[in-house]
């Protein structure tokens, strides 16, 4: 679990591809995601930065709701923690929607994105325009379905 905090969102990574592959390693298996920097560049940049910093290592999935989603990325495990900064939503020009198996930013309202994210079990169209979708599962749907509250992200590799 990370106790790192920053004052502002990270600078943009110059060599970030339009599609970035990320792997979340858990005791239940790996969740492999394609992250779409072409649609949500700030969000993907933030996720990559935090993953490379080890911010997510040892952090739990603190909220799990069956047939809805699994949520993690809060180093306190309470649902109120983050990296020390917030950044804006990315809806304009982003065609990604809350289908089954997407990764999206958890937030407390407009412009409050930080480190918390969720992965959907099923379509959640009521979240479109409220949370930035920035990727999709390419492997490990069964792992997402098996995750229980309190399960740990051992690490995220990008």
Describe each region flagged by the PLM.
Residues 1-158:
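Cyclophilin-like peptidyl-prolyl cis-trans isomerases
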């Amino acid at each position: 679990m990370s106790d790192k905090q920053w004052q502002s969102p990270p600078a943009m990574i110059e060599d970030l591809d339009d599609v970035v592959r990320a792997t979340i390693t858990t005791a239940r298996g790996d969740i492999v995601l394609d992250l779409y920097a072409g649609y949500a560049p700030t969000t993907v940049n933030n996720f990559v930065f935090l993953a490379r910093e080890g911010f997510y290592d040892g952090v739990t999935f603190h909220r799990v709701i069956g047939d809805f989603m699994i949520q993690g990325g809060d180093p306190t495990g309470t649902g109120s923690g983050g990296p020390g900064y917030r950044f804006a939503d990315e809806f304009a020009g982003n065609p990604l929607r809350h289908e089954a198996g997407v990764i999206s930013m958890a937030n407390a309202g407009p412009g409050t994105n930080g480190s918390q994210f969720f992965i959907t079990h099923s379509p959640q169209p009521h979240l479109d325009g409220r949370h930035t979708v920035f990727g999709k599962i390419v492997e490990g749907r069964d792992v997402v379905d098996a995750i229980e509250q309190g399960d740990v992200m051992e690490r995220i590799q990008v």
